[in-house]
């Protein structure tokens, strides 16, 4: 099953809606998430494996609104956005926690503890 007519970037596909889901994760406090120049998705999920700054069994899941990604300025000197870097064939990199989750005060859609 593919969405958007492409085979790019999907880690999972929602069997009910057919949406392509890209999953990003980090196991350190300050993530540096990388996207490919042709990355596409219908739904983006960020998995924080260290929500308290260290890996302790807690895992928090966030759904990230795509509209919050494409216009993020990643290079202030050149005023380059995420989309600009993709169009240049580059791999945009930034901290989803610092640029989206924390400033927007996003709440996890799911929290689990592997130790319970």
Q: Where is each model-derived feature located?
A:
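Nucleic-acid endonuclease domains
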Residues: 1-20, 24-116
């Amino acid at each position: 099953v593919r969405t958007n007519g492409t085979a790019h970037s999907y880690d999972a596909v929602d069997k009910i809606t057919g949406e392509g889901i890209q999953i990003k994760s980090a196991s350190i406090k300050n993530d540096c998430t990388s996207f490919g120049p042709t990355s596409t998705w219908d739904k983006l999920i960020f998995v924080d494996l260290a929500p308290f700054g260290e890996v302790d069994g807690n895992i928090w899941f966030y759904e990230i609104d795509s509209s919050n990604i494409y216009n993020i300025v990643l290079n202030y000197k050149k005023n380059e956005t995420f989309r600009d870097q993709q169009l240049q064939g580059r791999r945009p990199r930034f901290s989803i926690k610092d640029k989206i989750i924390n400033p927007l005060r996003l709440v996890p859609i799911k929290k689990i503890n592997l130790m319970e």
